[in-house]
Amino acid sequence: MTIRKAEEKDIPRIIELLGQVLQIHADIRPDIFIPNTTKYTVEELTELLKNKEKPIYVAVNESDVCVGYAFCQLQKQPFSNNMVQFKTLFIDDLCVDQQARGQHIGESLFEHVKKEARKMNCYEVTLNVWSGKTSAEKFYEKMGMKTKERQMEYILDNL
């Protein structure tokens, strides 16, 4: 397995994996996510691949077929009176093909993101994860991540 930056030839496979992730989210929160959709279109992914501030890394097998990805965003904390200035590499989405799980591909992708973040002189790697005792939460904790802040919600029942 190799990890590299995503290329246009990876887009069809990335779309498939985006569908897998969306279905997991729709199962957890059917009140928010629409099943059988994806976060990005082919056109949006084509444009995203050109954005150096939003790198996409893919894990590919021996046949150069994408079996996982990490969508990232370089974020800069601007200077303010109460916070120091720093850079973060935010993992917007990380997925391993459901048929390839258990082969440490997710760990390899996560380690690659950390390595790239260091090259970019980032202070931290961050991400959001849906709560509910999911396998994703367990995975990120295993990778050494800790809760930094927590977003809470109150669903209004008058909708």
PLM segments and residue spans:
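A short beta-loop-alpha structural element at the N-terminal edge
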Residues: T2-E16
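Conserved acetyl-CoA binding element of GNAT-fold acetyltransferases
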Residues: N82-Q98, E153
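Conserved acetyl-CoA-binding loop-helix of GNAT-fold acetyltransferases
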Residues: D93-V96, G102-K115, K142
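Conserved beta-strand in the GNAT
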Residues: V58, V65-L74, C95
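A short helix-loop-beta-strand connector motif used in the catalytic cores of GNAT acetyltransferases and
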Residues: E43-V58
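Conserved GNAT-fold acetyl-CoA-binding loop/helix
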Residues: Q23-L45
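Conserved GNAT acetyl-CoA-binding A-motif
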Residues: A117-N128
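Conserved active-site alpha-helix within GNAT-family acetyltransferase domains
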Residues: E107, E111, K119, S131-E149
